[in-house]
Amino acid sequence: MSILISPSNNTGWGLRFPSKMFGGAKKRSDQHPVRVRGHYRAPWGAHKRGRTGRTTVDDAIDAVVEEARNYTPTPPPVSTVDAAIQTVVRGARRYAKMKRRRRRVARRHRRRPGTAAQRAAAALLNRARRTGRRAAMRAARRLAAGIVTVPPRSRRRAAAAAAAAISAMTQGRRGNVYWVRDSVSGLRVPVRTRPPRN
C-alpha cells in the first residue's frame, strides 16, 4: 500500500515536481524533513468550517417558532343579534311546517257532501275495515241488493260516484279493490279478496 506524502493538499505524488517531495528542497536533509503524518486528511466532520455554537438569538427564534406552531386562534365573539335572528327563523320554519301538516291532515279528513251512493260506499268501506273480508263481501251484497230499484241512468251515475269515492278513500291504504259482478243483481261490487279464476 502506497503512502501519499505530497504536501500540495493530496493532489499528486510529486513525481513530476521533485521539489514538492521534501517540503520545497531538492533532496532530503535534516533541515527539510518529510512530515508524513501531517498530510493525512482528518475524518469527516472533524473540522467545523464556519459553524458556530448556538446563541441566545437561536433560542429566541426557536421559541417563536414553537409558539407559532402551537397557536390556536381564539373563537370570534358570539353575536346575540345573530342568535336572536336564528331563533326567530327556526320558530317560523317550525310554525310553517306545523301549519302545512295541519292543512294536509285537514285536507285528508275533509268531508265532502256526497250522494247516497257515495255515503253507502263510505259506510261499506268503514264496515269492511272493522269487520274483515267476509263481512265486506256480505256488506257489498247487501248494498248491491239495495241498489236494484235505482233507475238505469241513475244506477250508472251512482256506480261511478261510488267507484270514485272508493278509489279516493283507498289511495292511502295498501291492498287492491276488485270489482266483481254480483250474481243476484248483476251489478259490479267492490271486494278486497281476489275472485277465483274460472
From Swiss-Prot:
GO cellular component: host cell; host cell nucleolus; viral capsid
Residue numbers bearing the Phosphoserine modification: S183, S185
Keyword Phosphoprotein: yes
N6-acetyllysine carried by residues: K27, K48
Modified residues (Phosphothreonine): T55, T74
Propeptide: 2-24
Position of sequence motif Nuclear localization signal: 188-198
Region (Disordered): 24-55
InterPro entries: Adeno_VII (IPR004912)
Keywords of the record: Acetylation, DNA-binding, Host nucleus, Host-virus interaction, Late protein, Phosphoprotein, Viral penetration into host nucleus, Virion, Virus entry into host cell
Positions marked as site (Cleavage): G24, A25
UniProt record similarity statement: Belongs to the adenoviridae histone-like nucleoprotein family.
HAMAP family in UniProt: ADV_PVII
Quaternary structure (record): Interacts with the core-capsid bridging protein; this interaction bridges the virus core to the capsid. Interacts with host NPM1; this interaction might play a role in placing the pre-histone-like nucleoprotein on the viral DNA or regulating viral gene expression. Interacts with host HMGB1; this interaction inhibits host immune response.
Descriptive protein name: Pre-histone-like nucleoprotein
Organism of origin: Human adenovirus C serotype 2
Upper taxonomic lineage: Viruses, Varidnaviria, Bamfordvirae, Preplasmiviricota, Tectiliviricetes
